[in-house]
Amino acid sequence: MQIKLENPLLLSKVVELISNLVIEVKFKIDSSGMSVIAIDPANVAMVRFFLAKNAFSQFDLEAKQEIWGVNLEDLKKILRRAGIKSSLILKREENRLNIEMSDKIKRNFTLNLIDIKSEDKEMPNLEFSAKVEINSADLIDAVEDCAVVADACSFVIENNNFIIEAKSLNSARSEFSGDEVNIQAENCKSKYSIEYLNKFVKGSKLCDKTILNFANDHPLRMDLNIENMELNFILAPRVESED
């Protein structure tokens, strides 16, 4: 099998994002495209990546499905060598992945494929009471503000306003009205780890808008949609026990 990307920089950025959560993943390649679904070692976060077949200039698949077990740290280092004008060809040869980059010169790398024993995963079918579409730059700023004062922040829907706030000895708060963000929600509140949110919102830099789905003390799903690509993160809530 052989697949080709004319611009591998987006793939490189996504691999770097996923590697912040998990190191070893299975790439699944089938007639629809390329996908990854993985859970971080702490079972707190989940990521799904899908790159549609239409994103590739060449997509020759001999079997119904190919599975590549990959160490993302190794793949990340190789993809960083791609330039702005590079094209990328991925070709499996037995237990290795041949990676060819072409621009002024043709460069070849080989990546050893690994056997990953974990079971195949599916994204859970979650129900949410809140859906917020927000400017990605505003989301990044709000999360970074909260990181200054605490290690967790709350996503709040209150009277059709969306609030991101953190409270400890100090506090931070960003409030967005329905005029600034697209809100489809009832009043609710849930708290999430800033350590993980900071990893997620790095992905928001890839697109202008980010979609947040959540509910009372409920997992968060963050959706990033770019042409021919989907990137989804799920984060468990931080539920504090009552004394």
Feature-to-residue mapping (PLM):
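DNA polymerase sliding clamps and clamp-related checkpoint/processivity subunits
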Residues: M1-S19, K26-V148, V156-D243
